[in-house]
Each structure stands twice: as structure tokens, then as C-alpha cells.
């Protein structure tokens, strides 16, 4: 049983995972969350007496021996989930690509969608899948990048000895972008494939084929088919089960408790934390909020580009959608490449319209008969919305919402079935969660490979968790970063205790 105390700022998946691991080892953990719910991007909020997901709706890594499933098993957490064999369709200007798990059906889909270059596309994807397998193998070794201490290696040395060809292949492709791999198959100018990859990558790694690092992108482009899961009661259940486990282990979670100040006491070698419901000193701090509390306390303060999101939440009549959704296992997603008929979308946003249909639920999480929930997000630059006057902001927001619904209408009749819709911009995110940026940093070769962001900050005994962990971004990487931070604290505080005795 450790007497060490740790404060976790932010109850996202990364913060909750680190708190659960530390609490299991006997550390006294206190989680401070600004919102009324836990889970962060895997959480939820209430609008018009309906429960909407904050961000993610589909989970990855929950297959048997999957990364997230393994972490949960280590924490003695059972999380029921149902696999989705056809989780998404990507709507391109000249066709559609269905993302399906079955390998034979997927190859058929590639041949049909990219018929003129089907041979090259199939070979490209086979290589991508192999690289993805290699990346997953290294990630399963629990190596934490950048490697600064011996324990950051995890079991990578053993993995390298057992899989020399795999590691050599990763070394060969380490500095590749996705476009570089496309060039090997003379596909860099093949626009239909480029449109598919850009749509998938912007959502997953926050950039396009020209800049996306191949190694993390290979996993992002294959992860839907590796295993997509619907968690019973929604993605918010992941945060709930982690929070419950922390409490069972003696940890404390304080919601609606935003942090006001964070100061390091050099003489005591402790952090003084002041929030609405907590004023105390801690041996270590983990920042999962994405908010800066001073130099070196968050990656938000660095000169690094991040996207914001334009978001539409809606409730639809299920009856009018029954024909289109009757063969779909919900949640079901569409990525829609916008047409030229949507000038406001093209001026203010970037990439595809990402829309997910799910069962509508009330604040208690109970299904609402006759309704379908629709959540929509588009990438947008952070600064443009604050430059508008109040009237311009309102007008452009309404126009982008209108065009977004029209883009979805090309695929499924939402307008005539619309019961309620509400839009938000990065300014809305800032108002409710304290930050405009979402989704992490673009996974360029620099950000992902040559200068990855560590869970250790430049400040003593302060750690940063979130979507920056390799292979990132997303819930899976957030959970991994939480594990890495907990591992670092257990090792570092033990070393600090020995130093204090001398």
C-alpha cells in the first residue's frame, strides 16, 4: 500500500485509466473533472432530454486479446460490447466504399470501387495491412515513445528478437508518409483512392495522405476492419466503468470541480492544487484536461496546429428512416466527401462530413421508441469563428448546418424526418469544456515518429495524458497514455522516495 498521492486533472479515458492503475497499486488518487459527467471525448451530455455522445461512438481494441480489452482485463473490468461487421460507408463524389470486416468482401469492395486500378489498390492495401500488423505488435509491447528510461521500452527488446523481419520493415517505413507508399504502387495521382484515404485519415490522424505518417496511419486505416464495437449503453459506459473501478479501489472522483491553480512547491517537492471542491498537495499530477495551467503543464500551450469541430446533434423520426437503416446494425456511420454545391462547408470546414446514426436514449440511457439519434462533425479551423461579428457568426453557422443536412440528404432522407437539430462550433466547445481544439495533433512524421510527445512533461512529477500517445489518436491511445503515465509515476516516485532518504 503506497502513501503517495496523485491528482488527475480531467476524467477523460486517459486520466481515468491512469487513476485506475494507480489506485489498484494502492496510490491515493483524486480525479478532478470540470464537467458533470466522466469520459471526456468518450462521455456524454444532455440536450432536449436526450443523451448525446460527446465524441466517439464506436470503440476499437475490444476484440479478444485486443489492446483496450487487455487493459480492462488487467483492471478487472468487464465491459460488454457487440462487434460491428459493417460499421461504415464512405461516400465519394463518384461512388461508395463499404468498410466491412470480412476479408473476401473487403477485397471485392476494393475491386468494385477502384475497378480501373483494382490490382494496384489491392496490393497497396495488402502492404498497408502488413505494416498495420507490425505497428500493432510493437504497440502491444507497451513501448512508450519517446524512450527516455529503460522501462519505457516495455517488452520491445523481446518482441524485436522474436520478430526481426517485422521490426526491420517498420524501420524501413518509419519516415514514410501514406503518399510515399502510394507512390510505390503508382497510385499517388489516382484521385478516387486519394479521396477515400483523405476522408479516413483526416478523421483518424488529423491530416491527409501528403503529411500523414505511414506507421500510425496504417493502423488508423485498418482498425475499423480489425474490430469495431458498440458498447452496451454507449461509449460513455467506458468512462463509467473506469470511474466505478477507481471508487471501488478507494479513489476519489470530484465532478464539477474545475482547477483554478496548479503550483509546484519546490521545498516539499509537491504540487499544490486548488479547485472548486479540492485544495490539497499531491506527490504527482496527471493533466488529462488538454488545458494549460502554466508553462510545461499541457501540450496546448505549444505552437502546434490543432483542429476544431463543427458539430450538429439531431433527433430524427425512425419511421421515415426505416428503409435505409433496416439492414444496418446501429451505430452506423457515413463519411461523406462534400459536393461542390456546399460553398459554406468548403469555406469554413475541411474534409468529410462524419455522421453517425444511433439509438436515441433519454437521460437515464433508456431507448426512446420511434426516434433515431444523429451526430455530425466536420473539421474546422479554430480561429475563423472568433473573427465573425455576432450576426455573421449566427448566419454562417445556420448556413453550414443547412448545407451539412443537404449533404447527408444525398445519402439518407433526414430533412423530412428531423425532429430537432442543434449546431455547435469551437466556441461552443470552449464554453462547455474549456478548450476549442479536439482530436489531438496531426500525426505527421515529426509528431508521430521523430518528435513524439511524451507522457512526461518538462515539469517535475507532472505527466500529460491524452491522444498524443503512439499510435494515436483516439480512445485507444488515450487509454494507453494513461497506462504509460501510471507506470512512470510508480517508477519515478519510488526513485524519488529513495533520493529523499539520503
Residue ranges of predicted features:
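N-terminal glycine-rich phosphate/pyrophosphate-binding loop and immediately adjacent elements
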Residues: 3-143
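Active-site/ligand-binding neighborhood in enzyme catalytic cores
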Residues: 129-249, 437-445
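A glycine-rich dinucleotide-binding beta-alpha-beta segment and adjacent secondary-structure elements
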Residues: 192-207, 413-472
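Mid-domain catalytic core of redox enzymes
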Residues: 230, 258-368
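C-terminal segments that line or cap access tunnels to active or ligand-binding sites in enzymes
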Residues: 319-426
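A conserved FAD-binding loop/helix module that cradles the flavin
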Residues: 467-489
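Active-site-proximal substrate-binding core of FAD-dependent oxidoreductases
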Residues: 491-502
Amino acid at each position: 500500500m503506497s502513501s503517495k498521492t496523485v491528482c488527475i486533472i480531467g476524467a477523460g479515458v486517459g486520466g481515468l485509466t491512469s487513476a485506475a492503475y494507480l489506485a489498484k497499486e494502492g496510490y491515493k488518487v483524486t480525479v478532478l473533472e470540470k464537467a458533470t459527467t466522466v469520459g471526456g471525448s468518450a462521455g456524454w451530455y444532455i440536450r432536449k432530454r436526450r443523451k448525446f455522445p460527446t465524441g466517439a461512438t464506436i470503440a476499437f481494441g475490444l476484440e479478444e486479446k485486443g489492446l483496450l480489452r487487455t487493459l480492462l482485463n488487467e483492471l478487472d473490468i468487464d465491459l460488454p460490447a457487440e462487434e460491428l461487421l459493417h460499421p461504415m460507408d464512405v461516400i465519394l463524389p463518384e461512388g461508395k466504399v463499404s468498410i466491412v470486416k470480412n476479408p473476401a468482401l473487403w477485397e471485392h469492395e476494393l475491386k468494385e470501387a477502384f475497378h480501373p486500378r483494382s490490382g494496384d489498390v489491392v496490393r497497396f492495401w495488402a502492404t498497408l495491412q502488413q505494416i498495420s500488423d507490425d505497428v500493432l505488435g510493437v504497440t502491444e509491447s507497451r513501448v512508450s515513445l519517446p524512450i527516455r528510461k529503460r522501462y519505457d521500452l516495455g517488452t520491445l527488446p523481446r518482441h524485436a528478437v522474436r520478430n526481426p523481419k517485422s521490426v526491420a520493415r517498420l524501420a524501413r517505413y518509419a519516415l514514410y508518409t501514406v503518399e510515399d507508399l502510394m507512390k510505390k504502387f503508382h497510385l499517388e495521382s489516382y484521385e478516387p483512392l486519394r479521396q477515400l484515404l483523405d476522408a479516413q485519415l483526416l478523421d483518424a490522424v488529423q491530416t491527409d495522405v501528403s503529411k500523414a505518417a505511414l506507421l500510425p496511419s496504417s493502423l488508423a486505416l485498418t482498425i475499423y476492419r480489425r474490430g469495431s464495437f458498440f458498447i452496451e449503453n454507449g461509449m460513455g459506459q467506458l468512462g463509467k466503468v473506469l470511474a466505478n473501478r477507481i471508487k471501488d479501489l478507494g479513489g476519489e472522483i470530484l465532478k464539477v470541480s474545475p482547477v483554478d491553480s496548479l503550483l509546484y512547491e519546490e521545498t516539499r517537492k509537491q504540487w499544490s492544487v486548488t479547485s472548486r471542491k479540492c485544495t490539497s498537495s499531491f506527490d504527482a499530477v496527471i493533466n488529462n484536461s488538454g488545458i494549460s495551467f502554466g508553462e510545461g503543464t499541457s501540450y496546448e500551450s505549444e505552437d502546434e496546429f490543432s483542429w476544431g469541430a463543427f458539430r450538429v446533434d439531431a433527433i430524427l423520426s425512425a419511421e421515415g428512416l426505416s428503409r435505409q437503416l433496416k439492414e444496418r446494425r446501429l451505430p452506423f456511420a457515413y463519411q461523406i466527401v462534400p459536393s461542390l454545391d456546399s460553398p459554406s462547408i468548403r469555406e469554413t470546414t475541411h474534409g468529410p462530413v462524419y455522421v453517425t446514426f444511433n439509438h436515441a436514449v433519454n437521460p437515464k440511457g433508456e431507448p426512446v421508441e420511434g426516434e433515431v439519434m444523429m451526430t455530425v462533425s466536420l473539421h474546422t479551423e479554430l480561429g475563423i469563428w472568433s473573427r465573425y461579428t455576432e450576426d455573421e457568426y449566427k448566419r454562417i453557422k445556420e448556413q453550414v448546418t443547412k448545407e451539412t443536412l443537404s449533404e447527408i440528404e444525398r445519402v439518407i432522407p433526414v430533412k423530412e424526418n428531423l425532429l430537432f437539430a442543434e449546431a455547435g462550433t469551437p466556441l461552443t466547445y470552449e464554453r462547455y469544456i474549456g478548450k476549442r481544439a479536439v482530436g489531438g495533433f496531426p500525426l505527421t512524421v515529426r509528431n508521430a515518429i521523430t518528435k513524439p510527445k511524451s507522457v512526461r512533461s518538462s515539469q517535475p512529477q507532472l505527466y500529460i495524458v491524452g491522444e498524443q500517445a503512439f499510435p494515436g489518436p483516439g480512445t485507444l491511445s488515450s487509454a494507453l497514455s494513461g497506462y504509460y503515465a501510471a507506470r512512470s509515476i510508480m517508477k519515478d516516485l519510488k526513485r524519488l522516495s529513495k533520493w529523499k532518504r539520503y
